[in-house]
């Protein structure tokens, strides 16, 4: 089931990210409190919102959110 809003996600749901051509290029596992665990050079826990993954160290979005699928 594809979720309409990030607020509907729970820990364990999968978030998918695309590039500017619309190709899926990245996936992560949703955690609590709008965080995600994913591998981007190394395994990371970052913030996520309706735009995508925000890297606080780089102060920029690194991945554009395409959809979140309910897994649990």
Residue ranges and their predicted role:
Residues 1-9:
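Catalytic cysteine-centered active-site loop
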Residues 3, 31-72:
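Aromatic- and glycine-rich peptidoglycan recognition patches
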Residues 9-10, 23:
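Short gly/pro-enriched beta-turn/loop segments at secondary-structure junctions
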Residues 10-11, 64:
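Short beta-strand or tight-loop elements
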Residues 12-14, 34:
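Structural motif
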Residues 16-17, 38:
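A generic structural signal for residues embedded in beta-strands
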Residues 24-32:
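Catalytic nucleophile-His microenvironment captured as a short glycine-rich beta-strand/loop
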């Amino acid at each position: 089931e594809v979720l309409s809003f990030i607020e509907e996600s729970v820990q364990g749901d999968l978030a998918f990210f695309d590039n500017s051509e619309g190709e899926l290029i990245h996936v992560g596992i949703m955690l609590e409190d709008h965080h995600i665990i994913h591998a981007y050079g190394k395994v990371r826990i970052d913030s996520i919102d309706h735009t995508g993954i925000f890297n606080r160290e780089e102060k920029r979005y690194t991945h554009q959110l395409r959809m979140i699928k309910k897994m649990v």
